[in-house]
Amino acid sequence: MKILFLADANSIHTIKWVESLHKHELNILVFSLFKPTDDVVQKYQNWGIPLISADLQSKIRNLRVPNISKLNYLTAFRLLKKTMNAFEPDIIHAHYASSYGVLGYLSKFKPFILSVWGSDVYDFPQKNQLNKWLLKKVIHSANTVCSTSEAMKAVIATQFDRFDVKVIPFGVDANVFAPASESPDQFTVGTIKSIEAHNGIDCLLDAANIIINEYHNTYIHFLIVGQGSLLGEMKQKTTDLGLDNYVKFTGYIPHEKIVEFHQKLSVFISVSTRESFGVAVLEAAACGVPAITSNVGGLPEVNQNNYTGYVIPPNDPEKLANSIFKLFKDKNLKDQMEENARDHVTKQFNWNKNV
């Protein structure tokens, strides 16, 4: 069977799907709007998977267009049609509705599978009515729509009148994401998120301030991984709160280092104000790390309150600080949640089963 993937070749989620389906001896070609990095190209070559790139970023830059709009995506459509004619796919599978999904819709190819990822459903249609109209067209053009969470499936039903969505969560390879052989030397609270307003980094810093400066606990440290438009502002806030000795920002880390990051943690934090799924929570859980998450989007599906961690309202640093402190004070509770977290992932979110 020939499957044409319309997806960002650089995305770790695309890479995982392609590698796993390739192991099932499916014939796959990846069509990416943007140029893949050299290491990604090498991975696809090692698997013997052809990769076509529209290199849209370079073309837009050469045309001196200030940003990439949906109209700019149409410049890649001619290359896509040429690719389809040469490859003759049996199935087209587009990942991310508001870009690759648009190309799948325009191709008029059937069968067409659409996988929605999050911001394509939560953010893109909220910008204007044209976006919402376009996304509804894309969603209804697909033979099958796949969502990573029940929460996002509900949004697609209520906002776009598509009710037969299949839920296939992002899974975790528990052989790769596994507990460290030894416990961490210090109690470290961590998160891996883009440093943007909706991801609750400011809430985490406020909770750190409560723990350090109000609870007077100097044994808990904080590790924040990621980059984004608010990184400088969050670093300055850390300094202003007098937390520089307790909070470390690492910036971006490559995916192959994420296991090592999780294994350093005592507690993982994800207190976003919106979240389609929460794969990082599952990766932490597979490493035996309990989580504290907000009760939004798909997060309650991956983190069970009082079992694998705590589920709290977003923007509530007092509750976040209190939940962290509970796990710090009660080692037996933390040990049990570590065991529960690992068990939950291996039984409910096994990557091979999801594939």
Cite the ranges covered by each PLM segment.
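A short, well-ordered alpha-helix in the C-terminal region of glycosyltransferases
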Residues: K319, K326, L333-Q348, N354
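Short hydrophobic beta-strand element within catalytic cores of glycosyltransferases
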Residues: P290-T293
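Carbohydrate-associated surface elements
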Residues: A151, G171
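A conserved mid-protein helix/loop that constitutes part of the nucleotide-sugar donor-binding site
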Residues: I12-E19, S194-N213, S229-G232, E318
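Conserved donor-binding/catalytic core segment of Leloir-type glycosyltransferases
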Residues: L4, C146, E182-N209, L223
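Conserved acidic donor-binding segment of nucleotide-sugar-dependent glycosyltransferases
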Residues: N305-N306, Y310-P317, K326-K331
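Short alpha-helical donor nucleotide-sugar binding micro-motif in glycosyltransferases
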Residues: Y252-I253, E260-L265
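Aromatic "clamp/platform" in nucleotide-sugar-dependent glycosyltransferases that forms part
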Residues: T273
